[in-house]
């Protein structure tokens, strides 16, 4: 979505809410409580963006008690034609809520104007359409949300397929509510998947967390995968900055086979 102009009608609708800059703590609390929250809308992500030379701001929408009810982390970077603002998997607001979206859009516009940004682009972390494993739609798409953004001056950039250059638009989610144990969960997968899990168990595969000095291993594995799956890998420096920004909240995992342990267990 790209943001353009607002109208007098929108300004009147936003009068019930106030916009102010949130502290890092306020924003993290908002993100944690919001159904639209995620790691890309956190203070840690702001630290990561700042390490790349970007300016960041926590734009918050507060109620009459000054309590945050919606907001967005905006990262401003120098583009080819001027400063550009990005809301990664944001804003933290229901796109179908006309009043809150109107007020928040006004606040985002003002934040962009203060840094002379030429555009704002957002990737809302809100479901547009739920599909089954075969790709069949299970409900009507949320076109009302798209129309609401457009009413506020945002322009829809269209849908994409496959790996996106900036943001993943497709998410596969496994509903675990119907399973009471690991055995039932495993049984729900296809035969080939169950066989691969069994092979991994019998082969002594171990999963562990890498420390910072081992991130080159993670990078090299991603590089091999990117060549096979045709997506762009990140640099080792990027992974190190993610590690530094998120601390214990970021886990870089690796699966290993320790042949000596495997052979010893097989002999026993």
Predicted feature locations:
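Acyl-donor binding region in acyl/amide transferases
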Residues: 81-164
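Short, low-complexity, intrinsically disordered N-terminal peptides in bacterial proteins
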Residues: 1-18
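A conserved beta-strand-loop-helix scaffold within acyl/acetyltransferase catalytic domains
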Residues: 17-65, 69-81, 132, 154-168, ...
């Amino acid at each position: 979505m790209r943001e353009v102009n607002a109208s007098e009608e929108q300004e009147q609708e936003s009068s019930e809410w106030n916009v102010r800059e949130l502290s890092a703590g306020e924003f993290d609390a908002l993100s944690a409580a919001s159904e639209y929250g995620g790691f890309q809308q956190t203070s840690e992500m702001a630290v990561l963006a700042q390490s790349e030379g970007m300016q960041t701001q926590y734009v918050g929408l507060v109620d009459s008690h000054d309590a945050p009810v919606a907001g967005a982390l905006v990262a401003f970077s120098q583009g080819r034609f001027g400063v550009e603002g990005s809301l990664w998997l944001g804003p933290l607001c229901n796109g179908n809520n006309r009043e809150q979206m109107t007020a928040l859009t006004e606040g985002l516009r003002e934040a962009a104007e203060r840094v002379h940004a030429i555009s704002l682009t957002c990737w809302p972390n809100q479901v547009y359409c739920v599909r089954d494993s075969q790709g069949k739609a299970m409900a009507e798409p949320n076109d009302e949300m798209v129309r609401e953004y457009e009413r506020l001056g945002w322009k829809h950039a269209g849908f994409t397929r496959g790996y996106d250059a900036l943001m993943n638009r497709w998410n596969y989610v496994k509903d675990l509510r119907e399973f009471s144990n690991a055995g039932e969960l495993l049984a729900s997968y296809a035969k080939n998947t169950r066989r691969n899990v069994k092979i991994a168990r019998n082969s002594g595969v171990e999963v562990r967390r890498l420390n910072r000095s081992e991130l080159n291993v993670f990078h090299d594995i991603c590089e091999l995968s990117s060549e096979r799956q045709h997506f762009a890998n990140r640099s080792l420096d990027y992974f190190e900055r993610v590690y530094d920004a998120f601390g214990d909240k970021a886990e870089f995992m690796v699966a290993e086979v320790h042949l000596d342990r495997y052979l010893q267990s097989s002999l026993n």
